[in-house]
Amino acid sequence: MAAVSVVNVERSLARADDRASPTPIRDFAHGLRKLRKFQYLYLAETAERGIGVFAAREFAPGDIVMMDFDANYYDQVLSYKELCAQKIDLKYPLQVGPDRFRVPSGSLDDFLNHSCDPAAGIRMYPHGIVVVALRPIRMHEEVTFDYSTYLNNPYEHLICRCGAKECRGIVGNFDTLPKDRQERYMALRVIGDFVLEGGVVDGAG
């Protein structure tokens, strides 16, 4: 399984850092540098879901798989109305609060795919996130999380093709999960606080 893009990019990054380079290129180079700090993970193509994040070693339950802390982590946050106005596909942003969605920024966690039987879960902090293993993760296994653990948006329902034995077929809000699954995720502390607070998404406009 071949890794994607993070290898042998030093020359390209140096050119991109040139002040004559357009700002988007410099920003992209900065994003690639962020990817390299996750030494036990890599990006690769999945069979049906585009690029995913894969484990370069084994992880035990409770292990930290990745951490992404940055004072600016939540800078690129939009409301639902702003997402729609900018025609951003709803399957890409991560909901981080009531009517607050963090758009992709070039970090490795942008490529985490959904699974109804996830290998990992996300814990949110004021300056970023921690991804923890929920079960043993094999080397070269895809690192996934359950999107419903960070979803409280009545306008968003995604068709699921995760391939898990217990695939739900639809990815909906946290409160659509079976009760035992909700309780498990709460016990593991891998849900967004806002999914329990009844946050409101403004879809008018």
Regions found by a protein language model. Give the residues of each.
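C-terminal SET catalytic tail plus cysteine-rich post-SET Zn-binding segment of SAM-dependent SET-domain
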Residues: A2-R15, C116-G205
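Catalytic cores of histone-lysine modification enzymes
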Residues: N8-G121
